[in-house]
Amino acid sequence: MEARLIESREIAPAVRHFEFEALGVERLEFAPGQFTSFTDVIGGKEITRAYSMASAPLGTNRFELCLNRVEPGHLSPRLFEMKPGDRIEMRQPLGMFVLRQPARDSIFIGTGTGVAPYRSMLQAHLHASSPGFTLLFGVRYESHLLYRTEFEAMAIEYPHFRFWPTLSRPDSTWKGRQGHVQAHLAEAIEDRRNLDFYLCGLKEMVDDVRAVLKGLGFDRKQIFYEKYD
């Protein structure tokens, strides 16, 4: 299967939002939270990298991704150089990082482009009668709060959705939460125990949050995660 780039745009320094279409299918089937893999030959070597879907299934062959340019990277520089109409080999979406059914109140914890699968999940599952969701999103700088306007609009429309952006390196104008996401877990949990937790981001953050949650007495079956280096 091949993917053809429709358009891409910068949404933060060194971060781009991509819209692709999967060729050869009328509808690309996947569950919100899953990932696809791209493959290309770079420097004579076949390189494959996995990227989380950043959109809910659209009922068409189109899908969206959110990628940061890794320097030095193997595949991301190639993707950042792609022009509309360019093609790249892709695989059918896979992955187990999806919302457990039946869904219940959940806390989504993500850093950087690890917010992508949560955008997919929220687009698909957040509605007037859905469980309550909290998105605890950590980045260094305010300029890297990806999809901020979308999440803020969701929080206005659906009072049972809470968007909690957190900056680890804020400037003097920032009035929101500060530090790492781990510091705000207890506030997000309140006194609730009937919760599920979804963790996506760098390995260090995911491991730290898992340890905190286990220390608070939550069962490992309540904790779902996807991590990367």
Q: PLM ranges: what are they?
A:
Residues M1-P84, R140, R169:
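Ferredoxin-reductase
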Residues E2, T60, G132, L136-D229:
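Reductase modules of NAD(P)H-dependent flavoproteins
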Residues E26, D105-S106, N194-F197:
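Short active-site oxyanion
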Residues G33, G114, L202:
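Short, conserved phosphate/pyrophosphate- and ester-handling motifs at nucleotide-, phospho-/glycolipid
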Residues A50-N61, R100-G112, L216:
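Short, compositionally biased
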Residues R91-P102:
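A short, basic/flexible loop-to-alpha-helix module at the beginning of a structural domain
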Residues V115-L126:
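Histidine-anchored nucleotide/phosphate-binding helix
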